[in-house]
Amino acid sequence: MKVYLLLTLTFFSFDLICQNLYELDPNKNYLDSGKKLMNLDFGLHNLEQDSKNTEILIGIHGGDSRGFEWIYPLQKIDDDKMNTYFFRWDTTKCPQESIPLIMNEISKLEGIMKITILGHSFGGVLASLLLNEINQVKTDIHVIASPLASKDLEKYCDYIHPKTKNENISYFQWRTIQKIDFAFNNLDYDPQVIDFKESSVIRLPDKYRGNRLGHLWSISWVADNIDVIN
């Protein structure tokens, strides 16, 4: 009985720690699939354990994420040349506090030739702090519907968007229309707008698949259009 219980706990823990990207359902069971992502421990998780590639894709979620908004985008962007990862972090803390964790996790990966990072909302703020952290490896950083100019983050976290970036990094800002983004439309300024010349800025349209293109849908729209700029 003890052995059986131990095996049960072992497999249960493994299920929480390791998720397979293509076992996650973006459609009928999207809520349960989202929970599986958000139940992962804090850290960087390989969603394709059986694949060994030299390119990686990392999704960084925002605050109050339910996970499901990531399933379609990660599956859409993923291809046979890359491994897809999901970074779980404590969004109750300032983003600077999670930089050592993600950098330590990235440094453990061997043979990586290219990194693509997608940071959504608060996760984009964390991603922006990697502009001067990742060296040598070619890296594309995409921040999506992210409050990079947030007055609250500056006040409570001393967050100021970096002024420079490393030469190996390409930087892309994907901005929603503020008045239809419920995360930002109550503000008297657009917290997505910063002055950073070494980046490409893409303003998202107002509709996606016939619906309002708001905060959560923004990742899916980027997934459908990211190849246009690459």
What annotation goes with each model-predicted range?
Residues 1, 17-19:
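Juxtamembrane and targeting peptides
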Residues 1-7:
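Sec-dependent signal peptide recognition
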Residues 19-113:
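Active-site catalytic motif of lipid deacylating hydrolases and related acyltransferases
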Residues 72, 97-101, 156, 186-189, ...:
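Surface-exposed beta-strand edges and their flanking turn/coil or helix-capping segments
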Residues 77, 86-181:
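Serine-dependent carboxylesterase/thioesterase catalytic core
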Residues 160-230:
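C-terminal catalytic-base region of ester-bond hydrolases, centering on the histidine
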